[in-house]
Amino acid sequence: MKDLYFATGNKEKMQIAQSVCEPQGLKVISIDLDIDEIQGEDPEIIVRDKAMRAFEKVKEPVVVSDDTWDIVALKGFPGAYMKSINYWFSSDDFLRLMHGIEDRRIILHQYLAYTDGNVTEVFRNDIPGKIIHKARGRNDKSPNMTVIEIDSDNGKTIAEIFEQDKDKITERYKKRRDVWHEFVDWYKNNSN
C-alpha cells in the first residue's frame, strides 16, 4: 500500500479520504500543518499555493483540500472567502442575509490539490444545494452547515447528515463520485 500524506486536522475529511483511497491501495496519513493561505478570489490558485506550502514543510508528496461556496443569488458570495465568512457568520447571519431572496441555490465546490514538488494537479467537484429557511441540526465547528441542504441528501442539512451515524458518512462517499474518486483515478494512472 502506498502512503499518501493529507494535510488536514479535520477528522471528517480524513475519514472520507480514507474511505475512498484505502480500498484503492493508498494509505492516507493525516498531517496537521499550520499553513498560511493566500487570499484571493480564485480557489484554484489558493489550493495550488496551499499544496506547495504543505510540500515545503513535509518534503513528501502531499494532498490538501479546500472547499468554497457560491450562493447564486449573491453572485458567488462567499466564494474563496468561505473560511473567513464561516468564522464570522452564524447560521442566523446566513438566514438574515438570504431573507427575502427567492433563489436560494448554493454550489459547494470541493477542491483537492496534489503535489510532489514537480507535478501539481488540482481536482474539483461541484455539489448543488440550497439554503433553507430555518436551521436544522447541530454543528459546533461550522454552524452554517445547519442551513444548507445538498440536493442528493433527501432534504437533510449537512449538519443533520453528520449528526447521524458517522460511519454511514464514509459509506456515502464510497458510493458517491466526488473529488477524491477523481484524484484516485488520476493518481493510479500517474504515480510511479
Where are each of the predicted segments found?
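Anionic-ligand binding patches
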Residues: 2-5, 12-192
